[in-house]
Design a protein with these regions (language model features):
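N-terminal Rossmann-like NAD(P) cofactor-binding subdomain of oxidoreductases
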Residues: 1-90
Length: 90
């Protein structure tokens, strides 16, 4: 399963990542997603370094599941775009 965490660089996104790690949530691929200004930032999850990607790129990656922890406006704009490509949006 390809999992996207939208808003990964924010406070809530960081907490979601902690919960995913604590509960050993199963996934094959992880996409850390944030605003375009945060794209390119490096983050570590479970000892592996990830590069944060922007929302547009994340939609094109067609994740199976996207967990949104971004602000309301961002979620209202982008959640439907993820759903349109078949992503389950949480």
């Amino acid at each position: 399963m390809k999992l996207a965490v939208v808003g990964a660089t924010g406070l809530v996104g960081s907490e979601i990542l902690e919960v995913l790690e604590e509960h050993q949530f199963p996934f094959d691929e992880l996409l850390l997603v944030a605003s375009e200004r945060s794209a390119g930032k490096k983050m570590t999850f479970k000892g592996k370094e990830y590069t944060v990607i922007g929302l547009k790129q994340a939609v094109s990656e067609k994740p199976d599941v996207a967990i949104f922890s971004a602000g309301g406006g961002t979620s209202l704009e982008w959640a439907p775009q993820f759903a349109e490509v078949g992503t389950i949006v949480i």
